[in-house]
Regions:
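Cap/lid segment of the alpha/beta-hydrolase catalytic domain
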Residues: 1-85
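Short, glycine/acidic-rich beta->alpha junctions
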Residues: 3-8, 52, 100-104, 168-172, ...
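Generic recognition of stable, solvent-exposed alpha-helical segments in well-folded globular domains
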Residues: 6-11, 59-66, 101-110, 116, ...
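Generic recognition of flexible, low-complexity loop/linker segments
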Residues: 10-13, 55-56, 84-88, 106-112, ...
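Short, well-ordered loop/turn and helix-capping segments at boundaries between secondary-structure elements
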Residues: 18-22, 29, 70-73, 77, ...
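Active/binding-pocket-proximal capping segment
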Residues: 29-32, 39-43, 116-119, 124-131, ...
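Primarily recognizes the serine-hydrolase "nucleophile elbow" in alpha/beta-hydrolase
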Residues: 70, 76-136
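The feature captures the conserved acid-bearing segment of alpha/beta-hydrolase catalytic domains
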Residues: 126-182
Length: 182
């Protein structure tokens, strides 16, 4: 779930090495594995608090935007010789790209719509309309099981999922996708 370790191996690492890319990855605050416990405990005790939960994931988006901006600015002034061999940055700040897959594709819609620092990105397997996504997400299956154990029936679960969806309105890629540019 939204962890930087997803960029540390597998095909993306091989692709980066083959094409000469470097990867900067960060946990998606509010949407990563450590956040799942907070989400689960609130689902069981007070699902009505979920409309407030957009704040942490939105901070995660802002963190990603700040990292991108630092790639164009602060990181270029780094003096550590491991990062600046020959006193030059190890990357070309005019060639920054975004790649997000699954949750990274979904939340990446917000990042790509808001950033002025990246012209191109790949949104792999993205989605929009969080209430719809929650029903289809393999990661959310465990939460639905918790809901079934905590609420009386399908109607209650649907109401809780509706509340959940309203909490994501400010994060929904449907809100931001019109601002993606070519």
């Amino acid at each position: 779930l939204g962890g930087k370790d997803e960029a540390e191996g597998g095909w993306i690492r091989e692709f980066a090495e083959r094409k000469g890319f470097i990867i900067l990855a960060a946990d998606m605050q509010g949407m990563s594995t450590p956040d799942a416990l907070t989400w689960a405990s609130n689902l069981l005790t007070d699902a009505g608090r979920f409309p407030l939960f957009h704040q942490q994931p939105m901070q995660g988006v802002m963190n990603h935007l700040a990292l991108i901006r630092m790639m164009k600015g602060r990181f270029l002034t780094e003096t550590n010789p491991l990062l600046t061999p020959g006193s030059k940055p190890i990357y070309d700040a005019t060639r920054l790209y975004y790649f997000g897959n699954s949750q990274g594709g979904t939340i990446g819609t917000l990042i790509m719509a808001m950033t002025t620092d990246i012209a191109r990105g790949v949104l792999g397997v993205p989605g929009c309309a969080f209430p719809f996504l929650l029903h289809r997400s393999i990661d959310f299956t465990n939460f639905v099981t918790l809901l079934r154990n905590s609420y009386d029936g399908p109607l209650d679960i649907s109401l809780v999922l509706g509340i959940l969806g309203s909490g994501f309105n400010r994060l929904d890629p449907l809100t931001y996708s019109p601002y993606l540019r070519d």
